[in-house]
Amino acid sequence: MEDTSRCIDDVLKIGQQEKEIRQAEFSDAQGEREEVKCIDYTVDLEAGLPRHESSGKSNTLKQCYNAVLGFLEELIIVIIIVLLLYSLTMVGLFYVMTMTKFLF
């Protein structure tokens, strides 16, 4: 009998949670992003991340660290691309110089 009442309570809780989810409030924060609030859990719809990992303006040390690492990764990629283009240009110039030397 206790198991049956527990199951009924669980089903009622799940039903209540589904009802609260259906009645989620959409709010527009300064016209920049939308958030869904439901059962003390907020999701940033723009980024699809939970609030504590949201793309909002939160100055935590971890976010600053991640931003710096991201910047360094992008910088390294740009430097590698520039060096590849430079080396290809130098190889091309060397080829043109040697060909003109042989032809003329």
Swiss-Prot record:
Keywords from the named record: Membrane, Transmembrane, Transmembrane helix, Vacuole
Q: Where does the UniProt annotation locate this protein?
A: Vacuole membrane
Main location as per UniProt: membrane
Q: Name one GO cellular component term.
A: vacuolar membrane
Transmembrane annotation, as ranges: 76-96
Summarize the record's induction comment.
Answer: Regulated by phosphate levels.
The protein's topology relative to the membrane is:
Single-pass membrane protein
Q: What's the superkingdom here?
A: Eukaryota
Ranges in coiled-coil conformation: none
* Gene Ontology process terms (BP): phosphate ion transport
Query: What is this protein identified as?
Result: Phosphate metabolism protein 6
